[in-house]
Amino acid sequence: MPKSDQVLLDLNNPVFQEDLFSFGKEEAGRVFATLRELKRLSWSEVHRDKGLRWELVQSKRGPGGMRLYTIRITDKVRALVCRDDQFMRFLSLHRDHDSAYR
């Protein structure tokens, strides 16, 4: 059983999967390395990790009005995510960092 602050990943969003499968082998490998790292972290560690750059998206809301956030996945890719209790739900991946905020 995961500890109460443990990050659980939800990678089932079709848009996220489409984005992920569009990456080449090397870039996809870097994305998976970050996902493995995230799975080992607690939520408090995610918020403190300067490399991930957890940022609130002010310009839009997610499903059911949930707040949206971006995190740095690689030096070239950001993910749009929302937090749902222990789950970090991945909504999309963005090669252009600015597009994650639109």
Question: What is the role of each PLM region?
Answer:
Residues 1-77, 83-102:
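Basic, Lys/Arg-enriched alpha-helical interface segments
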